[in-house]
């Protein structure tokens, strides 16, 4: 009896240990400094880049395609958002601001394939350093450390504003929108993608959903989530907006990214193993949050919103 009970007990203890590590090392949002610290750590330990590549965002999976490489899907996402938002109508040399640029993946595509002059900003000094390292000389990209809630550019400095999965880290969504649209020239383009919750006033979360949302907020430095409709309204009523906002839910295109991000560690085990035991623990530690994200987006508790409007 003992020989059957002991392995079971060891498994329980292992899972309990992982749960304790997961909870103790939660990354709760306190101020924007906690966002900067989290992304500094994620960049410096190299694990996220090894697994996700140069793009720290979800991929785009056309519904008729059975399989697309995880990293290629991320590149595809950038091109799809460019086309959907109308940025491809802008002439070469147009000035683009990439808000929450990460390590510069989107910025480099916008510069290389569309001929744009791109400025990327992120609150993480480590991300700026890495973005500069990854950017070939001669490519029209520059990267700066800057808070998206306090942009240091003159009004109307850019022909387009681009932002992917940054807004969920902003505690003041209206200020986030105001800063972006203030820096957009009249008639310019805004292209934005972000993680949203469903409308929790119209469809209140169950007890289980509340627990899940709490973990999604606390694990990856998110102060709050709002619905696609609420964010669209913030864009619509802003004094610098032309007023017409188009939004869509891209859950069906992006959902495969979640389980693909786990499978990626199996496809490229050396990318984790080469970083040592600490990286293995860190990668395992993220799996529960990814599973909860996958569940939330598939159940409709969370929604992947894309937005476009003009200045």
Feature map (PLM): residue ranges:
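N-terminal auxiliary segments of SAM/dcSAM-dependent transferases
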Residues: 4-49
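Acidic carboxylate diad motif detector
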Residues: 192-194
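Substrate-binding/catalytic lobe of Class I Rossmann-like enzymes that use SAM or dcSAM, i.e.
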Residues: 204-206, 211-301
